[in-house]
Swiss-Prot record:
It comes from Danio rerio (Zebrafish). Disulfide bonds: none annotated. Keywords: 4Fe-4S, Antiviral defense, Endoplasmic reticulum, Immunity, Innate immunity, Iron, Iron-sulfur, Membrane, Metal-binding, S-adenosyl-L-methionine. This is S-adenosylmethionine-dependent nucleotide dehydratase RSAD2. One of its GO terms (molecular function) is metal ion binding. The lineage of its organism: Eukaryota, Metazoa, Chordata, Craniata, Vertebrata. The gene is rsad2.
Length: 359
């Protein structure tokens, strides 16, 4: 007859057996799982994704780059313009302009990050609020931020003497775009409004710059319509502090390709044609040449949303706005080549107080 003690001992022995069997099978399952995982990793190596380099992949690469000081920044705060230049590479794709307090906040962020020079451009910067918005930004940058240099690029057609009277003291450099000293050529290019004389505006603004002590500069885009022109006599007479000579540039989505507002292919010249133009004008000491490569890599460009634009791939890939992520994060994706910036003479005497000009 089995006693109660014997039954209890048998029950305990059975429980121990069951636990040992469970432990054995759990260990076996873990071992098998590890073997299967290891085999899977060996059989399935990490895939290399083969696709064209995208903005996202470039941003990952950019995130490892050291911080770039934004010493000179070009702020295209509006895309609107009253001219229709056929090769324009910053076209009127939006009508957006930041509220002025937001624009000022972004400019302060840039100053805190090391900005010394701000250049306002467009579009045509005098279009918005008839130049008063631009004037207040110029005033803010010189008075409040105390930037060494504040400059503007304009076509000159909308500038009035009253603007110089109010804001001229705070502006260091005014660059006027002029591609030809032949009126018919300017009309063909689109550097005109109706039948008004672009050259008359150029000379008028030049005289105001002398009167109100603003350094005068000329920007010219060399293209199929003006590449054979000799501008030596006219540039010498106008005597700008700098004559920037650009090779006509194609930018996908702006003046070339699908969804572009311009078709600039017919304006494009070869590198040799550009070099011939430069050699024809080599006697002009203030000439600063800019080939396509220099233009793509050596400018810090902010769009109307205060996003840096990376033009290295022949298109404009935007960063996030400095208003959202700050300058240090956004500038990683600007595509900016500081060495090229210095090679093209990007850093020069850019404060009118240091230019020792004869007004």
């Amino acid at each position: 007859m089995v006693t109660s003690n014997q039954l209890g001992f048998a029950r305990l022995l059975m429980q121990l057996c069951v636990k040992n069997v469970q432990s054995f099978f759990l260990a076996l399952l873990r071992w098998l799982s590890m073997q299967v995982s290891g085999a899977h990793v060996q059989q399935t190596p990490a895939r290399k994704i083969s696709r064209p380099e995208s903005r996202t992949s470039k941003q990952k690469e950019g995130s490892r780059a050291p911080f770039t000081t934004p010493s000179s920044v070009n702020y295209h705060f509006t895309r609107q313009c009253n001219y229709k230049c056929g090769f324009c590479f910053h076209t009127a794709k939006t009508s957006f302009v930041l509220p002025i307090e937001e624009a000022k906040r972004g400019l302060r962020l840039l100053k805190e990050a090391g900005m010394e020079k701000i250049n306002f451009s467009g579009g045509e910067p005098f279009v918005h609020q008839k130049g008063s918005f631009l004037g207040e930004l110029v005033l803010y940058c010189k008075q409040e931020l105390q930037l060494p240099s504040v400059s503007i690029v304009s076509n000159g057609s909308l500038i009035r003497e009253s603007w110089f009277q109010k804001y001229g003291d705070y502006l260091d450099i005014l660059a006027i775009s002029c591609d030809s000293f032949i009126e018919e050529t300017n009309q063909l290019i689109g550097r005109a409004q109706g039948r008004k004389s672009h050259l008359d505006n150029l000379h008028k603004v030049r005289n105001w710059c002398r009167e109100y002590k603003v350094a005068f500069k000329i920007n010219s885009v060399i293209n199929t319509y003006n590449v054979e022109e000799d501008m030596t006599e006219q540039i010498t007479a106008l005597n700008p502090v700098r004559w920037k000579v650009f090779q006509c540039l194609l930018i996908e989505g702006e003046n070339a390709g699908e969804n572009s507002l311009r078709e600039a292919e017919k304006f494009v010249i070869s590198d040799q044609q550009f070099q011939d133009f430069l050699e024809r004008h080599q006697s002009i000491q203030c000439l600063v040449p800019e080939s396509n490569q220099k233009m793509r890599d050596s400018y810090l460009i902010l769009d109307e949303y205060m996003r840096f634009l990376d033009c290295r791939e022949g298109r404009k890939d935007p960063s996030k706005s400095i208003l959202d992520v700050g300058v240090e994060e956004a500038i990683k994706f600007s595509g900016f080549d500081e060495k090229m910036f210095l090679m093209r003479g990007g850093k020069y005497v850019w404060s009118k107080a240091d230019m020792k000009l004869e007004w």
